[in-house]
């Protein structure tokens, strides 16, 4: 074991030795950089940029660029980076994690690789956990970068699109992780390329990297829109479909399970809904709802395809006959069945776009991070993000006294001892920071201290607005501060001059399930070689102690006759606590790894759709792409109607009906002509006819209008289908674990079904685009429209629970926005009348 530890430590030592040589090169350059005037120092930036264009790399420039930043920092900020900070900067530049203890100057360290990588002009993102830190770092470190001639932007939630574009166009952009993720999602929902705000993701440095990539890794970012608008449409469509007659108003092909309105049915719909043309782009939503209602009534049968159970529609697996709880049909079919059966239509908010931090940050060309505590999660950083953790030595040796845990029999005994310790230290004037895991604990200790007459500050999620002020006072003589585990990160506790020789006392009221969080709390004391003391108080009733079965320990304390006021200091218990923490950390890592495997399925699909959207947005002419879609649609239709072995069983009439209803005019394709051809020969004359019709359509309007019409159709269909697909994948994901198939791996099942659903969505997109291009009437005032508008609601941080909930952005309809029922009227004149 010791051998392995040595080996691990040696790897880190080797890295430090290697970087020490580069630090010596930087030091050697100081004599030539120091005499430069401010103007000459600023001129170095242009010189570096020119050298990059001539073929030098950022690695070649590193020693000189770091020397320039060091000199500029001394002049502008009055701070000169130490050798260990230069090492931290090198580790960051190489795409690794610099583990630097609290107070070692991580923010200043980051300026070195930020400057070097910003010289490429591709943009560098500095990522922080909250907007306060982003604004603080942008204004403080921004002075240094601007002095050297680089532009600095800050990206805040409250900014307009134009302000965001300006922030991202800067050489260096300071932002929170949430805002970066949401901007990426929003950029992939826009309809014009000019509306995008982000540039390609080049290099990011994440401050408090463990908090963002580990603690928040399981928090998905979600942009959602209310799908309520559909509920009424499902009801109307359901009522309308009940009036239709088979054969007359719709045709149903039993073999292919294909159902569609006939000419009579289309006319009936236009009359019923008081519209001129059902295939008009304005009525996309209405047509979709009618088609799904038709399928619900004609194709789907109660107690065969689904059952009604406790007011819900539950799908029946066609192969095994089992109920597939938690699974829902996609594309609104499930809601249509709910309308048919008269149960509540579940139309909760619809996910328009989603991504996890794991997948967002893995898209950067180069990623690095800084934190005081990362070594315990090194395996995760290496396996998931391909980053090594490099422990940077401290500038001055750590002289902090980390005392062994004190274990009490009950919580009451523990808290009494904690308060007594605080009171004694307070009397001596020593500042005390009390770390708690839960808000309730911090409030309990606060009450006990108030009874003892000790003035103190509480820092938890309920009052994070005063966070920086409270932390700034925490190192003053006699200060007592109670903080929940994550509160106050990123802000240093500086000691008052009169207590420099005593230092800060950190008291932990219980061990957290992660050693990393305990280490963060310890790291609050003894910064930059200051004295300090840390002490954890545990009880046999703590959650972690209960987890690994401390009954034997409790029994031993009882046998020894130990009362509640007597703690034990036991290496055995401390070791047991540590092994329990390792087990919990292992479980959490497995959970995050599993989440990533599931999320990877959606990631691959998301990349395909977003790439295609980007191509559509940038393309001048989509005709070639659309013709390809028509070809696939026709080939699928032919294959579907001619799949039987015997020619007599082919459904050529059904094929002609399908083509006439969806793509061509009556009489364009004749049944007898197709009967003379083999299935592989049928597609060609049909496609030729389609292209002929396409050409006719082109002649009816200016080319520019035709090209815009194509884009309108493609965006409308792709965005509608994709949001429905995300929703369906959500339901599949929730329901996959409920399937009691026995020896089936749910992940494999999810991958296979998810892929099949994606393929079916692509086919559906191609068919619908082909139908609208061929059948829709083209209006003069064409406009691209968002299918559903996604709005942002940031999570409130009231309590630690908020951490694990998805960060959701919701949707609202403005009174002057177009109504979402598809009528084309403003909301206030349609469904919003009287609201």
Curated annotation (Swiss-Prot):
Residues 788-807 are annotated as: Disordered. Pfam families: P-loop_SecA, SEC-C, SecA_DEAD, SecA_PP_bind, SecA_SW. CDD domains: DEXDc_SecA, SF2_C_secA. The keyword Phosphoprotein does not apply. One of its GO terms (cellular component) is plasma membrane. May bind 1 zinc ion per subunit. It catalyses: ATP + H2O + cellular proteinSide 1 = ADP + phosphate + cellular proteinSide 2. Its EC number is 7.4.2.8. It is found in: Cell membrane; Cytoplasm. Its cofactor is Zn(2+). InterPro entries: Helicase_ATP-bd (IPR014001), Helicase_C-like (IPR001650), P-loop_NTPase (IPR027417), SEC_C_motif (IPR004027), SecA (IPR000185), SecA_CS (IPR020937), SecA_DEAD (IPR011115), SecA_motor_DEAD (IPR014018). ATP binds at residues 85, 103-107, 492. NCBIfam families: PRK09200.1, PRK12904.1, secA. Part of the Sec protein translocase complex. Interacts with the SecYEG preprotein conducting channel. Has a central role in coupling the hydrolysis of ATP to the transfer of proteins into and across the cell membrane, serving as an ATP-driven molecular motor driving the stepwise translocation of polypeptide chains across the membrane. HAMAP family: SecA. This is Protein translocase subunit SecA 1. The gene is secA1.
């Amino acid at each position: 074991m010791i051998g392995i530890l040595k080996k691990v430590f040696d790897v880190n030592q080797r890295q430090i030795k290697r970087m020490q040589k580069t630090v010596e090169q930087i030091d050697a350059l100081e004599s030539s950089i120091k005499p430069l005037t401010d103007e000459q120092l600023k001129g170095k930036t242009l010189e570096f940029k020119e050298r990059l264009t001539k073929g030098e790399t950022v690695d070649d420039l590193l020693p000189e660029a770091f020397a320039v930043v060091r000199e500029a920092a001394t002049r502008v900020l009055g701070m000169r980076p130490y050798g260990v900070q230069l090492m931290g900067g090198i580790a960051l530049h190489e795409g690794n994690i610099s583990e630097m203890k609290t107070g070692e100057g991580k923010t200043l360290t980051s300026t070195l690789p930020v400057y070097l990588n910003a010289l490429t002009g591709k943009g560098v993102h500095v990522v922080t956990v909250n907007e306060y830190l982003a604004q603080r770092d942008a204004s403080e470190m921004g002075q240094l970068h601007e002095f050297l001639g680089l532009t600095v932007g800050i990206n805040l939630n409250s900014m307009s699109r134009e302000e965001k574009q300006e922030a991202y166009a800067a050489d260096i952009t300071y932002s929170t992780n949430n805002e970066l993720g949401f901007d990426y999602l929003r950029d992939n929902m826009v309809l014009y390329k000019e509306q995008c705000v982000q540039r390609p993701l080049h290099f990011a440095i994440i401050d408090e990297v463990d908090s963002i990539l580990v603690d928040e890794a399981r928090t998905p970012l979600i942009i959602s829109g209310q799908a309520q608008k559909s509920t009424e449409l499902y009801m109307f469509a359901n009522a309308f479909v009940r009036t239709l007659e088979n054969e007359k108003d719709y045709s149903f092909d039993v073999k292919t399970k294909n159902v569609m309105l006939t000419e009579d049915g289309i006319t009936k719909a236009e009359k019923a809904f008081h519209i001129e043309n059902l295939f008009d782009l304005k009525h996309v939503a209405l047509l979709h709802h009618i088609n799904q209602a038709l399928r619900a009534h004609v194709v789907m049968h109660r107690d065969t395809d689904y059952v009604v159970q406790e007011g819900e529609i539950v799908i029946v697996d066609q192969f095994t006959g089992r109920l597939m709880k938690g699974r829902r049909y996609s594309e609104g079919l499930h809601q249509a069945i709910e309308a048919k059966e008269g149960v509540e239509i579940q139309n909760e908010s619809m996910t328009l776009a989603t991504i996890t931090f794991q997948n967002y940050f893995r898209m950067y060309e180069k990623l690095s991070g800084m934190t005081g505590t990362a070594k315990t999660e090194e395996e995760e950083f290496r396996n998931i993000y391909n980053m090594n953790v490099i422990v940077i030595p401290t500038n001055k040796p750590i002289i902090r006294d980390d005392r062994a845990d004190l274990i009490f029999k009950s919580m009451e005994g523990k808290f009494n001892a904690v308060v007594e310790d605080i009171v004694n230290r307070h009397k001596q004037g020593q500042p005390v920071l009390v770390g708690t895991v839960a808000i309730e604990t911090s409030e309990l200790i606060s009450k006990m201290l108030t009874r003892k007459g000790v003035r103190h500050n509480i820092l938890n999620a309920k009052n994070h607005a005063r966070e920086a002020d409270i932390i700034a006072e925490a190192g003053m003589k006699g200060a007592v501060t109670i903080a929940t585990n994550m509160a106050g990160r990123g802000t240093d506790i500086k000691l008052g001059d009169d207590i420099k020789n005593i230092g800060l006392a950190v008291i932990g009221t219980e061990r957290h399930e992660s050693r990393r969080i305990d280490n963060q709390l310890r790291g609050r004391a003894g910064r930059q070689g200051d004295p300090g003391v840390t002490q954890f108080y545990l009880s046999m009733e703590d959650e972690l102690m209960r987890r690994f079965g401390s009954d034997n320990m409790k029994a031993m304390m009882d046998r020894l006759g130990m009362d509640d006021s007597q703690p034990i200091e036991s290496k055995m218990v401390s070791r047991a606590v540590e092994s329990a923490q390792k087990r919990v950390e292992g479980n959490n890592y497995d959970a995050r790894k599993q989440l990533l495997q599931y999320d990877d399925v959606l990631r691959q699909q998301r990349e395909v759709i977003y790439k295609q959207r980007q191509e559509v947005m940038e393309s001048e002419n989509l005709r070639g792409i659309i013709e390809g879609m028509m070809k696939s649609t026709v080939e699928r239709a032919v294959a579907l109607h001619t799949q039987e072995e015997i020619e007599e069983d082919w459904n050529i009439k059904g094929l002609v009906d399908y083509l006439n209803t969806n793509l061509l005019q009556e009489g364009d394709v004749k049944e007898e002509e197709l009967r003379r051809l083999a299935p592989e020969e049928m597609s060609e004359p049909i496609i030729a006819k389609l292209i002929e019709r396409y050409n006719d359509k082109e002649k009816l309007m200016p080319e520019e209008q035709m090209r815009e019409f194509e884009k309108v159709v493609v965006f409308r269909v792709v965005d509608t289908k994709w949001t429905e697909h995300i929703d369906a994948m959500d339901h599949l994901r929730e329901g996959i674990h409920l399937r009691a198939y026995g020896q089936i791996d749910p992940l494999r099942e999810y991958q296979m079904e998810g892929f099949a659903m994606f393929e079916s969505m692509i086919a559906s997109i191609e068919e619908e685009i082909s139908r609208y291009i061929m059948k829709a009437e083209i209006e003069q005032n064409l406009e691209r429209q968002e299918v559903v508008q996604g709005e942002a609601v940031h999570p409130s941080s009231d309590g630690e629970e908020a951490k694990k909930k998805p960060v959701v952005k919701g949707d609202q309809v403005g009174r002057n926005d177009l109504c979402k029922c598809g009528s084309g009227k403003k909301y206030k004149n349609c469904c919003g009348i009287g609201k």
